[in-house]
Amino acid sequence: MSNLQAIIEAAFEKRAEITPKTVDAETHAAIEEVIEGLDSGKYRVAEKIAGEWVTHQWLKKAVLLSFRINDNQIIDGAETKYYDKVALKFADYTEERFTEEGFRVVPSATVRKGAYISKNCVLMPSYVNIGAYVGEGTMVDTWATVGSCAQIGKNVHLSGGVGIGGVLEPLQANPTIIGDNCFIGARSEVVEGVIVEDGCVISMGVFIGQSTKIYDRETGEIHYGRVPAGSVVVSGSLPSKCGKYSLYCAVIVKKVDAKTLGKVGINELLRSIEE
């Protein structure tokens, strides 16, 4: 355990006692160092190690602690002002820094300090919360929300109104993860630490949480909390055991490999689904 991690872990144990007035200098500095590290991409709340996603709980704890050490303050924003504990990521950005970091931010997009945005990303009017990581070449479309500590892979498209759940309220154990080369359809929600593996296509209006049944129609297998790589998913329903009613589920209607995904348009994949 590093010294920085040890400071965060110790502070989290006594978090109820920590306020902007009572926090000691060492703890304050440690929390700020973590937030800066998350902001720059040095740290990630979750990362893939040896093929498995690993959550660094101490980094998530630092994010939670950051709310304990800061008072609300006036935050300037275009034609308005805000009043919050967390600064905005781009508050002190210059044109040179935007050019250097290489992403686009459309007016009214909001990113909190402590979120990382990779090169070649496009942020339409959307919201990215503290601790989140947005991978290279990803599009966050209009009114999409990337929740606290959520991990978004490379070359992902989060369509209009998509919600990717966070970990802070309600408190979740692990962040929601969207793998590389995924497409998440308009108004879909992926929450509660669900992992969408690489190369998945999620149709419009699909809702997936930890208790959602993810039914593979080819194999009959039911998954919870994880969408297997290369899945094409639509919303559906499964009959109850008594046969008197049906309950919502997500249905894996087909699997595609990276080669097919690269050649075939998203709309074609979804339109070619046999009923």
From Swiss-Prot:
Binding site for substrate: 104, 141
Pathway annotation: Amino-acid biosynthesis; L-lysine biosynthesis via DAP pathway; LL-2,6-diaminopimelate from (S)-tetrahydrodipicolinate (succinylase route): step 1/3
Compartmental location: Cytoplasm
SUPFAM superfamilies for this protein: Trimeric LpxA-like enzymes
EC number annotated for this UniProt entry: 2.3.1.117
One GO cellular component term: cytoplasm
GO BP annotations listed: diaminopimelate biosynthetic process; lysine biosynthetic process via diaminopimelate
InterPro entries from the UniProt entry: DapD_Trfase_Hexpep_rpt_fam, Hexapep, Hexapep_transf_CS, THP_succinylTrfase_dom1, THP_succinylTrfase_N_sf, Trimer_LpxA-like_sf
HAMAP family named in the record: DapD
Subunit structure: Homotrimer.
Family per record: Belongs to the transferase hexapeptide repeat family.
Protein name per UniProt: 2,3,4,5-tetrahydropyridine-2,6-dicarboxylate N-succinyltransferase
Organism name: Haemophilus influenzae (strain 86-028NP)
Gene (name only): dapD
